[in-house]
């Protein structure tokens, strides 16, 4: 039997709600996965992409990653991973550097065999480039074959990548496809191949209300067994307030007090009618009551005059902007420029030069990046949880220098972290495998 942890969408470095504590929460969740691996007698940790939230993780995020990977390496547990859309760069990938340090294996066309199971990888590929993929791999004599991929695959919600096509065109018959990108965990069977999303390890948006976690996957000669494990993460309090015509801030405060707010992220959703409620007043009240951070979603109707009946704020303004940009159907190059302009890590005085360099680089290396993407329907854009980021023009040598500096500075410190690993329902896997699925790396 071969037993692996299937995780992904850890989004290290995400300073959600501009909170340093939330940034640390994402690293803490990843460390809990590692702790579970050390305690759980697993043969490997498989990461399905989006290790980082963006292409330029900062030094504390790199140091935390290196420390966690060294703990796995010291225990003889391989870390197998692919590159997701959030962290993908135009030059060298962070994962490549971790591999050079002996702390990770980047999966691709060539198999990496663990306990009789051959693992292959398929990095995230923008839709505009998928016609170039041939889904051909290097077959190997192994008991089982597994593809690890990042993208929105069928038969799950918001899909734009046909799993059936990958399976049909691949020269390897896969027993399972371990996926990342969709933050909602789910499992399905396609013609004898098990396809599963592990979900995110922390709540990357206010819509992710269910407990976070990962998959524990066991491969035996007769079956593929997929079980859900939950992680202990920072509590979120989702406060829904239905206001009557004469109700306002006092009713909202009363409702907020009904929840345990200690160190929680509080999301207040206003519905119904009622008086004007200033979001800032609600948010500051929740913080005074013990919350780490609070946000308000005012979803009340527009009045008869066509004006907004109340002030409106978003639970996560960054997510709202990304969602609107996604709806616009911009080209990869335009998305890259948008990210540069909005990136907090690029000084205002350097934005013009940075944009010019990226445009010149894309014109030289990837003219197709200026072709607009197919616009999604409003319904798809409203629900979709991932944005197809453009390839980064960052210099690979700079990436390497930063990673090696982090490697030298990192210390192998054992972090005392534990996780609640409540076993949820198990998929009812079958032993048969008819079709398969392929990769490009």
UniProtKB/Swiss-Prot annotation:
Residues at the active site: 86
Enzyme class: hydrolase
Residues noted as binding Mn(2+) 2 in the record, renumbered to the chain: 50, 85, 150, 181
GO biological process, alphabetically ordered: double-strand break repair
Entry keyword Cytoplasm: no
GO MF terms, alphabetically ordered: 3'-5' exonuclease activity; DNA end binding; endonuclease activity; manganese ion binding; Y-form DNA binding
UniProt keywords, alphabetically: DNA damage, DNA repair, Endonuclease, Exonuclease, Hydrolase, Manganese, Metal-binding, Nuclease
Comp. bias intervals (Acidic residues): 379-403, 411-425
Binding partners and assembly: Homodimer. Forms a heterotetramer composed of two Mre11 subunits and two Rad50 subunits.
UniProt-recorded name of the protein: DNA double-strand break repair protein Mre11
Organism: Haloferax volcanii (strain ATCC 29605 / DSM 3757 / JCM 8879 / NBRC 14742 / NCIMB 2012 / VKM B-1768 / DS2)
Gene that encodes the chain: mre11
